[in-house]
Structures are given as C-alpha cells and as structure tokens.
Swiss-Prot record:
Source organism (scientific name): Mus musculus
Gene Ontology terms: cellular component: nucleus
Protein name: Zinc finger protein 800
Bias (Polar residues) ranges: 414-434
Family, per entry: Belongs to the krueppel C2H2-type zinc-finger protein family.
Region (Disordered): 172-197, 205-224, 319-349, 389-473, 573-597, 633-662
Keyword Ubl conjugation: yes
Extent of Low complexity compositional bias: 205-216, 456-468
InterPro entries, sorted: Znf-C2H2_11, ZNF800, Znf_C2H2_sf, Znf_C2H2_type
Residues recorded as bearing Phosphothreonine in the entry: 320
Function of the molecule: May be involved in transcriptional regulation.
Biased composition, class Basic residues, residue ranges: 340-349, 651-662
Length: 662
C-alpha cells in the first residue's frame, strides 16, 4: 500500500500524490482535492485578503489560523519564526545577499511587508492642521492658539502658546473635541513668534498661586456648561464641559495622581466667548472638597459623610462652616479662653448630645432608623459609648446634667459605695439584700448631689436621685461593679467595659432580665441554647435534621424572666437545704459537722421524663443527669466547693451550667 505523500500543496511535482489510492480515507474534501490556484500566492495572497477581504475572512486569518513556514529550498516546515530564521541562517542561507545598511525602497518584498502592515493595522489618515493665533488685549507677551483641521475647520482646539504643548493638543483632538470657536475678525493666520519659555512658566505659575487664596471662598459651581461655567485645566489651559473629561485629561496627559486632580481644576464663567470675556473671566475653585485629602464630591452632604466616616478622629471644625453643617444651621465652635476651658467642658458635657427616643444625634443633626444605628454612630464618630440601661432615657432641658452622668452612674457611683450584697454568701436571703441596698442608697445619693451642684443647670438633688433609686438597686442586685462580677451568670470580667457590654445582654430598656430557652417537646428550660439542643438529642432522641428545623425557633421561643426569679431561686434553696440538713441530722443522730450534713442531704432524686426514660436530679443545684454515675461525679464538685469560703467563690470567676428545674 503506498504511503501518503507529505509534499507542499502549492508545488505540483506529481510524485504520486495524484495517483489513485487503494484505501480511501474519509475526511474533509478540501484535504483530498487538489489546491486551487488564485491570482496571488504566498504572503501576497494574505495581503490581498486583508485589503479587500470581508470582515469574517480577516477574523479567520487573525484569530482562527496558525501559520506554518516552509523553506522553499529544502521544503522543511516550521511552526515558529525563530526556528525558521535559525534554519535559514545555518542550513539554507538565502540565495540573495542583501545589504542591511542600504535598504532598497523600491524592493517588492519591502513594499509587500509595508502593505501587509498597512492592511492589518490601518493608521489614521494624516491630517493637516492650521494654527490660528488670537492676540490678548491685556497681555502682549501671550496669545491664544487655536488648532483646526483643514478638512473640518469647525472643529477648533484651544491651546497655549508653547510649541511643546501644541503637539500634545494635536494628539488629543481625535479623542476630545471642544466647541470654543473664536471670532473670525480677530483671527490672525500669519506666523507669530512664540514668546520665551520664562514668560510661559510665569503664566502657568500665576493661576496656581491664586488658587489656594480663592479656595477659601464658598462659590457654588455646576457640572454642566448650561449655567455658564466651563472647567479649565490649569496646566495647559484647556477647556472642558464636564468634570469627568478634565479629570481624565489630567490623569492621562499630565500623569498626575488622583489625589492631586483637584489642584489643577478651575472653573470659569463664560458669558460670551469674545476676547474681552476671556480677559475678564473669573476663576473659581471647587468648594465641595475634603480639606484633609482634597477629594472632590458632588454635594456638601457627601463631604460631611466622607469626613465622618473616613477622618473619624478629626472634628468637623476643620471643615469650613458652610460644609460642616446643613443649610440654615450655624456651626458652634469653641472660642473660649484657657481660663474658662474647665467650665466649657462641663457645660459641653451637660448639653444634650443625643435623643434615643427620636433616634437623633444632636451633635451632627442626623436621624437614624433605630437606636442600634444611633449607638453605633455615637461610638464610631463621636467616641461616646451608650450603655443599654439608659437606652430609653430622654434628654430634656431640666435633666441634662443628670443625663450626662448616666454612663458614670453605672460604674463610678457604685464603686464609691459598693453594696454589701457583693460580700454576702451566695445563699443569702433576698430580704437582707434589699435591706443592705437601702442602707447604701443615701451615700450614693450624696455623691450624686455633689456632682449635680457643680453644674449651673443641674436639677434638684431629690429629682436627680429619684430616677437613680429605681435603677441602681436593680443593677447592684445583679452585678458587682467593684469585683466586675455578674451574679446572674456567675462570670467575672477583666474590665468595666466588658462588664458594661455584658449588662446590655441582660437589659431591655429599663428592665433587667435573664433569658431562658425552652424545649419544644417538654417543660425543660435552660439558660444555654446548646443545653436544649443536647437535651433534645439525648432525651428525645431526635435526628440532626429535626434539630436544624428547631434551632431557628429556639430564639423565638425564648422567655425573658426577671432577675428576681433567679435570685429568689437561690434564696429559697438556702433555708430549704438547711432545714433538710437539720431534719436529717436529727433523725440519724449524727453530729452537726458540715461534711456529714452534706452527705446526708445529698441524695439524688429520680425524675421520670418519659415512660422509659428518667433523669437523676441533684437536690443541691437542681441539675439533672441521664446516668447515676454522672450525678455521683457531680456531687464531688459540691464537696470540693463546700470546703472553700462563699466569699472566695464569689470573687473567683466561674463558668457554671444552667440550673433549671425539670
């Protein structure tokens, strides 16, 4: 069977390629038929396709075709041009030796290559430009230059009188077109000698020096040219109709950074485009910009928002008054003497800073949709932390001094005279707690009256302490500010700030609560969500798919119970345990040693949850366990804690589980 011949299709040597084949190979018909002759071959054929071919043919040649180079001497094929050059250099040198120093312009190959490049990458037609010069009445050393094309005289471009800048303007006329047409009477088409470079530099420096002085003025400018304003590039004095165009021009042509764009933009009022109008034009700098980073904005409200969010540490006084406040609202700046600085600080603290009921910040006159957003704004922008206990307290003119001390009352006033409940044992009665708190309230009220008497607009001491009477016993009943201890969760904190954040979890307006999570299948409730999930898994034997449905509804089914429920439960357990110990010790006739009392009273109670499942509950703390061994292990923790003093246990931070009754 004869082999397929691999000769080039363009050469017709008939070495058996046209002879009949014994085994026909099905395939693409153009691969099987003879090559079709065209008027041109080789690279000339490609050039002709790019010249007169369709768009689809050009796309095929550029995108969908790879080139294979063939040496005409040895008929070797090369996929890459470097390999072909190396091959021609060492193995098949070209027949014609050409001199590189004297290239023949009329050479057909050079002409073919230039035609190919012109066909693939057509250049813009070479246009001739006319430079028209217009004199300036006020300055004899400078002229206005206008560049226009010969084919389109209506398109005119204004430029400065420097030749180097004229070349830049010629490059930009194809992309950016301006509509500034000078009067035909004042045009001078004869050649005028350009002024010296020093005068041009002085002209360019003059507007930049005037710009910082004019930046102090608050002049409203418009983005559109309909209002008679036109944007000018300070570097080349080119006019634009939009800010986007002048920014792109400065960034692309003059290679300036984004932060420096504002420095090179000016606005000019152009009532008419005559020479007198240009000479008497008013240069106005854009006023809606940030004074710190010089970033320009569309409105003054955007400047205020940018200043509050980006430059948080700075005050609004650094902005000009017309930007710092809304229209019609004056900006109050601190211009007091050093002697009165202490008084002004007190007066400033006594002023109303926010209104939680209206969700409004009184410092920057902003309203928010919720109190959470207002708290976040006060903390981020004004560095004022609002605690949850005073979330619904309104700031009226009569109680401004009292309201400014709300944050201090939670920690500092309690620190001066801590309630005795912090030093009482854990199983102390609730009645003793309230009696001790009532003893300590007069001392705290005295400290508060002293603070209120210092401010000039303070309310009466009785009115100031009236609201605190209802507030402080609740906070002190659940939290120890001196020890930084939460009695509800039995957790100790490292700082007052962490304790204050934790108090917000227990507060809902003026009420303090403890959240309990309930089991949807039984009466089991606990303070930890994961305990409910474990309870549903262990006790009710539910799958993870069921847990996925229930977990989302646990937060909705949660119950907010007052702290009296938790504190009373601890108080009620104390005497009941003592009575149980006392009765058991009498029946057994044993001694009154604490360890033996503990062992006698420490009997687990079996509680049936379902028909086939029961829990073993500890009668000390009310915890329930699935196995009796777990209950025995739990009893050992009570024995270890019984040896320690109750005060030591209270100061030490503990992480305990929920104490819910089944």
């Amino acid at each position: 069977m004869p082999l397929r011949d691999k000769y080039c299709q363009t050469d017709h040597h008939h070495h058996g390629c046209c002879e009949p084949v014994y085994i026909l190979e099905p395939g693409d018909p153009p691969l099987l038929q003879q090559p079709v002759q065209t008027s041109k071959s080789g690279i000339q054929q490609i050039i002709e396709c790019f010249r007169s071919g369709t768009k689809q043919l050009k796309h095929i040649l550029l995108k969908d075709v790879d080139t294979i180079f063939e040496c005409k001497l040895c008929r070797s094929l090369f996929r890459g041009l470097p390999n072909l050059i190396t091959h021609k250099k060492f193995y098949c040198p070209p027949s014609l030796q050409m001199d590189d120093n004297l290239p023949d312009v009329n050479d057909k190959q050079s002409q073919a290559i230039s035609d190919l490049l012109e066909a693939i990458y057509p250049r813009v037609d070479k246009r001739e430009y006319i430079i028209k010069l217009e004199p300036i009445e006020t300055n004899q050393n400078a002229v206005f230059q206008y560049i226009s094309r010969t084919d389109n005289p209506a398109e005119v471009t204004e430029s400065s009188s420097t030749p180097e800048q004229t070349e830049v303007q010629i490059q930009e006329t194809s992309s950016e077109q301006l509509k500034a047409v000078p009067d035909a009477d004042t045009e001078v088409e004869e050649a005028i000698e350009p002024p010296s470079i020093e005068t041009v530099v002085d002209e360019a420096a003059a507007p930049t020096e005037e710009q910082p002085q004019e930046s102090q003025a608050d002049l409203e400018t418009s983005d559109s040219s309909d209002l008679g304003h036109q944007l000018i590039c300070c570097l080349c004095r080119k006019e634009f109709n939009s800010r986007r165009g002048v920014r792109r021009h400065i960034r692309k042509v003059h290679k300036k950074k984004m932060e420096e764009l504002k420095k090179y933009i000016e606005t000019r009022k152009t009532p008419n485009q005559s020479s007198k109008g240009r000479s008497k034009s008013v240069l106005v700098s854009l006023s809606r910009s940030c004074p710190v980073c010089c970033k320009s904005f569309a409105t003054k409200a955007n400047v205020r928002r940018h200043f509050d969010e980006v430059h948080r540490g700075l005050r609004r006084d650094s902005i000009t008054p017309d930007i710092a406040t809304k229209p019609g609202q004056p900006l109050f700046l601190d211009s007091a003497s050093p002697k009165k600085s202490f008084k002004t600080r007190k007066q400033k603290s006594s002023k109303a800073e926010y209104n939680l009921t209206a969700c409004k910040c009184l410092l920057c006159k902003r309203k928010y949709s919720s109190q959470i957003m207002l708290k976040r704004h006060m903390q981020i922008v004004h560095k004022i932390t609002l605690s949850g206990a005073n979330s619904k307290r309104e700031k009226g003119p009569n109680n401004t001094a009292n309201s400014s001390e709300v944050k201090v009352e939670l920690a500092d006033s309690v620190e001066s005279s801590p309630p005795s409940i912090t030093h009482s044992p854990q199983n102390e009665l609730k009645g003793t707690n309230h009696s001790n708190e009532k003893k300590n309230t007069p001392a705290t009220q005295k400290n508060k009256v002293k603070q209120d008497s210092e401010s000039p607009k303070s309310a009466s001491p009785s009115a100031a302490g009236g609201q605190q009477k209802t507030r402080k016993p609740k906070l002190s009943a659940g939290f120890d500010f001196k020890q930084l201890y939460c009695k509800l969760c039995k957790r100790q904190f490292t700082s007052k700030q962490n304790l204050t954040k934790h108090i917000e979890l227990h507060t809902d307006g003026n009420n303090i609560y403890v959240k309990f999570y309930k089991c949807p299948l039984c009466t089991y409730e606990t303070r930890r969500k994961r305990d409910v999930i474990r309870h549903i898994t262990v006790v009710h034997k539910k799958s993870s798919r069921y847990l996925g449905k229930i977990t989302a509804s646990l937060e909705i089914r949660a119950i907010k119970k007052p702290i009296d429920f938790v504190l009373n439960k601890v108080a009620k357990r104390g005497p009941s345990r003592e009575e149980a110990k006392h009765n058991d010790s009498k029946q057994d006739g044993t001694s009154n040693s604490p360890s033996k009392k503990y062992e006698v009273a420490d009997v687990g109670i079996e509680v049936k949850v379902t028909k086939n499942f029961s829990l073993h509950r500890c009668n000390k703390c009310g915890k329930a366990f699935a196995k009796k061994t777990y209950l025995e292990h739990h009893k050992k923790t009570h024995k270890a804690n019984a040896t320690n003093s109750p005060e030591g246990n209270k100061t030490k931070g503990r992480s305990t589980r929920s104490k819910a009754l089944v």
